[in-house]
A protein has these predicted regions:
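ATP-binding/phosphotransfer module of carbohydrate and carboxylate kinases, centering on a glycine-rich
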Residues: 1-32, 55-56, 75-81, 126-275
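FAD-binding subdomain of flavoenzyme oxidoreductases
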Residues: 35
Length: 275
């Protein structure tokens, strides 16, 4: 959710709720609780605005709006201590300490933050292509790959494309960078290594803030489209995490944020824990 868009976001969520209930054959009941994790509500004002709008729309008796990072953390550690790093279109790290305290790192948005994310990688890939065209950098296979992905013919054509592109379109260049790196391009590999370095800085910052020492035993999990198990960026990030955060205990299980929301909701209404 973008700032100031609580009303439109609430309408979309309400419609999705109606569709879900209808598909389940539930036509007249009001859910006891809506526990949702959404992008763009990591700060209190956005969270409160969306929650207020959903109450106005009467989508459930009790409504809890949380961040997408929070429900991913809940699935990764089921209420226990740990740090999760999420990298998709944007990026953020979120964690819970042994004492239950919560902290976030990053997630400042794609304009001046979200380091290591798809949008961040895409923007830098465009810069590399421009630099190679100028002769400021060596030739790279990224040039042809990016031109093909953007469906333009020349580097000059990338200027109007980039100006008009949505953030998700720029982020969609990240898989192109990953594929080019996997094919052996040195510049693409260097960009992915830098992305991994940016992400591991988030882990280390939270390790120090929540656990006091990066050498402490710290459960760490990864989630998001760019950090699927086996991906080149994840491999680089795992390697750097083990080096920079010696106490990191990396979880290899798949993170399902929606399951984290269910677990959190069940704890609130005191029902048996979700599987």
């Amino acid at each position: 959710m973008r700032p100031g868009e609580a009303e439109s976001s609430g309408a979309v969520i309400a419609e999705l709720m109606r569709e879900a209930l209808s598909n389940a054959g539930i036509l007249d009941a009001v859910p006891a609780m809506l526990y949702g994790g959404f992008a763009g509500v990591g700060r209190e004002e956005e969270r409160r605005d969306l929650e207020t709008e959903l109450y106005r729309l009467e989508v459930a008796d009790e409504i809890i709006v949380d961040s997408d990072a929070a429900i991913a953390l809940a699935d990764a550690f089921d209420g226990g201590a740990g740090i999760i790093v999420i990298a998709g279109t944007g990026s953020i790290a979120y964690g819970r300490g042994i004492d239950g305290s919560l902290a976030r790192c990053g997630g400042w948005g794609t304009v001046f933050g979200d380091e290591g994310s798809g949008a961040w990688i895409g923007r830098r890939a465009l810069g590399i292509v421009a630099a190679a065209a100028d002769g400021r950098e060596s030739a790279t296979a990224l040039t042809g790959a990016i031109l093909t992905a953007a469906e333009v013919n020349t580097v000059e054509d990338l200027v109007p494309w980039a100006i008009a592109a949505e953030t998700t379109e720029v982020a969609a260049l990240a898989p192109v960078v990953i594929a080019t790196a996997a094919a052996g391009d040195a510049r693409a590999n260097a960009l992915l290594s830098l992305a991994a370095e940016e992400l591991v800085v988030h882990v280390r910052a939270l390790a120090l803030r929540l656990f006091g020492d990066e050498r402490a035993s710290i459960p760490v999990a990864f989630s998001g489209g760019l950090l699927q198990k086996g991906s080149l960026l994840r491999k680089k990030l795992e390697q750097r995490t083990r080096s920079a955060v010696p106490g990191a205990q990396i979880k290899s299980v798949e993170i399902i944020p929606a399951r984290g929301a269910v677990r959190s909701a069940l704890r609130r209404i005191r029902l048996p824990s979700a599987p």
